[in-house]
Amino acid sequence: MPTLTTVAKAKEMADDTRVELKGKITKHIRSDHYEFQDASGTVEVEIDHKVWAGQTVSPQDTVEISGEVDKDAWSTEIDVKRLKLVK
């Protein structure tokens, strides 16, 4: 399991690096893409339907996500493999 990191640090990591982040899903962008935010900044995340596992998350809820950095020439996003609502 990767150690908790920040959005700012995750954006600097290599493609396919496993990351775990704690923060909030602040808005829906399109399809299965969302904006994730922590104290260091924001990053686009991709969360497939099955990863939600029936959980309902609002922008006020804190979540932990784990997945992989997905980098291309223009952007960095996180491909989320696990999402957990923090109570």
Listing of model-derived features with the role each one plays in the protein:
Residues 1-87:
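OB-fold and OB-like single-stranded nucleic-acid-recognition modules
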